[in-house]
């Protein structure tokens, strides 16, 4: 259970309906490349003949590469971005992987994973390295981050084979093209500056946890972005609502931080303003952005009190469902 799941089903109707009713509408957005918001545009990176599993890989690896590009470019937040980007993979590596029987005789996995971390760090430090090699390393880190999925469906030797298997050429080539478009859209355009404030994968504790999980893609200079690498583009309330829900959770964190400054440790945006939300359609180089204050989507103290009430009402159930699945998989014996 997570924010995404909550918005797609009717189990927690009061929270879903609140977010849906207040999510900025299509007309509130502005595109960086078109006069009309969410207008169908020519695809700059063609989808091609790829399988669903390849599309999933492309989405995850491209998101990772976008953050690496930002970490390499900015000055102040370079290390913070890199560490946040790899936090989940490292947690699973140190926790689930090393404590599971799959680790036996899998020194190759450890070496492969640690080499991937070294390659991506060198890229961030602006060392000369071929982009395809960085993408292969990003794929390795993605597989460790996706460990719960892999350990659930593969036995020990199958896991080893799949973990060491390189990313196929079709995926690598598409991620390359998506990375080039991202660099043009965010870096070369001047949207991101050397001194930009960038926070990768911000979470919103304790409110993310109470909703069963919730981590945003990236925050850049007051705007919270969600990345989409699918071939379809258009306005969908639940996709926009997901980013808006993160804004709401951050508002709750900011409220908490007035009473307890340690909130900043688990909610990195609690001390920052989210002035707007945006969807980036990476195959089109299109950013659809909404300034929250201009469309009446900011929240009052009364709104926050209501949100706090309904989230707390469902918190135990959402947490239990999220944690029981993670614990079940981590404790599997192969």
Give the location of each predicted region.
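Residue(s) in the substrate-gating loop at a strand-loop-helix junction
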Residues: 1-181
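Eukaryote-skewed repeat-based solenoidal scaffolds used as protein-protein interaction platforms
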Residues: 176-201
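Active-site metal-binding core of divalent-cation-utilizing nuclease and nuclease-like domains
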Residues: 192-219
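Short strand-coil-strand connectors
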Residues: 212, 221, 282-284
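Conserved catalytic cores of phosphodiester-cleaving nucleases, focusing on short active-site segments
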Residues: 217-232
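Active-site-adjacent loop/helix micro-motif of nuclease/hydrolase catalytic cores
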Residues: 232-242
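An active-site-proximal "capping" alpha-helix that borders the catalytic cofactor pocket
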Residues: 242-249
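Metal-dependent nuclease catalytic regions and adjoining charged, substrate-binding loops involved
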Residues: 259-334
């Amino acid at each position: 259970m997570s924010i995404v799941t909550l918005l797609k089903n009717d189990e927690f109707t009061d929270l879903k309906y609140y977010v849906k009713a207040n999510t900025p509408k299509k007309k509130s957005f502005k595109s960086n490349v078109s006069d009309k918001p969410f207008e169908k545009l020519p695809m700059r990176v063609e989808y091609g003949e790829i399988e669903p599993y390849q599309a999933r890989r492309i989405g995850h690896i491209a998101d990772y590469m976008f953050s690496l590009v930002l970490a390499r470019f900015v000055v102040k937040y370079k290390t913070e971005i890199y560490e946040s980007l790899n936090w989940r993979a490292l947690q699973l590596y140190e926790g689930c992987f090393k404590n599971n029987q799959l680790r036996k005789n899998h020194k190759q996995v450890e070496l492969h994973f640690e080499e991937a971390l070294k390659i991506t760090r060198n890229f961030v430090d602006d060392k000369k390295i071929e982009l395809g090699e960085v993408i292969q390393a990003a794929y390795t880190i993605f597989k460790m981050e996706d460990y719960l999925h892999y350990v659930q469906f593969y036995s020990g030797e199958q896991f080893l084979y799949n973990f060491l298997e390189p990313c196929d050429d079709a995926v690598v080539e598409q991620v390359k093209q998506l990375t080039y478009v991202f660099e043009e859209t965010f870096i070369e355009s001047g949207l991101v500056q050397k001194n930009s404030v960038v926070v990768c994968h911000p979470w919103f504790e304790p409110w993310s946890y109470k909703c069963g999980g919730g981590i945003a893609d990236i925050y850049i200079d007051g705007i919270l972005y969600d990345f989409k690498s699918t071939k379809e583009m258009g306005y969908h309330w639940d996709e926009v609502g997901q980013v808006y829900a993160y804004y709401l959770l951050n508002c709750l964190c900011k409220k908490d931080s007035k009473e307890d400054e340690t909130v900043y440790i688990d909610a990195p945006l609690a001390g920052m303003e989210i002035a707007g939300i945006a969807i980036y359609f990476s195959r089109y180089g299109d950013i659809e952005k909404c300034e929250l204050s201009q469309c009446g989507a900011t929240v009052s103290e009364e709104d926050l009190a209501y949100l706090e009430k309904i989230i707390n009402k469902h918190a135990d159930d959402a947490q239990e469902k999220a944690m029981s699945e993670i614990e079940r998989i981590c404790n599997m014996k192969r």
